[in-house]
Design a protein with these regions (language model features):
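Short glycine/serine/threonine/alanine-rich loop segments
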Residues: 43-45, 83, 145, 183
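Active-site-proximal cofactor/substrate-binding loop regions of enzyme domains
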Residues: 47-111
């Protein structure tokens, strides 16, 4: 798997199928998006995950940065699932101020050669989070790609989300968390010499 991190200056030569998101926990909802882009490999598209580093919530001080999975764990999961390219786009106040239309035109269409986007129904991107799946659907025909919006997944009548899974983990409700993750939950413990 190719990893592009720490730079906004990149170009993907191969046509791509892209999933955009934070992918914290790589839970069942995320996997649904990933299944869509992986399914496009049979049409010659490279499966590409686009994520922000740090997340917008961390950049703007709305989150403490606690995540279900570390960067290294996410990378291993993506590689195991068959993702071809992972882009960890550097999010700064400047890049976060990119208008959504410019993001779609310059980054998705030109830099990434996007031909297909799997978008969660709660996708937001660009300045003030103003970009969404609906905007991508409107712009897609003019930019040479198509968009499939994926509905939220529920487990036992509850919407799967990283926020809810973090709550389950904090409460020690591991079986429920693992059901939404679709895999066992692991945590890394670091020790220091005493």
């Amino acid at each position: 798997m190719e990893i592009i991190a720490g730079t906004t200056d990149f170009y993907l030569e191969k046509d791509t199928a892209v999933a955009i998101g934070k992918f914290d926990g790589v839970h069942l909802g995320h996997r649904r998006l990933l299944e869509e882009i992986l399914g496009r490999k049979k049409y010659g598209l490279a499966a590409c995950v686009f994520t922000f580093d740090p997340t917008p919530a961390v950049l703007f001080g709305l989150s403490d940065g606690k995540e279900l999975t570390t960067r290294e764990e996410k990378r291993r999961l993506f590689e195991r699932l068959g993702i071809d390219t992972l882009i960890e786009f550097p999010l700064t106040k400047e890049t976060a101020a990119t208008e959504p239309e410019r993001f779609a035109t310059e980054i998705l269409a030109k830099q990434m050669n996007t031909r297909f986007v799997a978008a969660g129904e709660d996708l937001s991107f660009g300045k003030n989070g103003a970009g969404n799946a609906e905007l991508l659907e409107r712009m897609a025909p003019h930019l040479g790609f198509c968009v499939q919006t994926i509905e939220k997944i529920e487990v036992n009548g509850i919407e799967v989300s990283s926020t809810y899974i973090r709550k389950l983990v904090e409460e020690g409700r591991m079986e429920e968390a693992e059901e939404m993750l679709g895999m066992p939950y692991t945590c890394l413990l670091y020790t220091s010499p005493s």
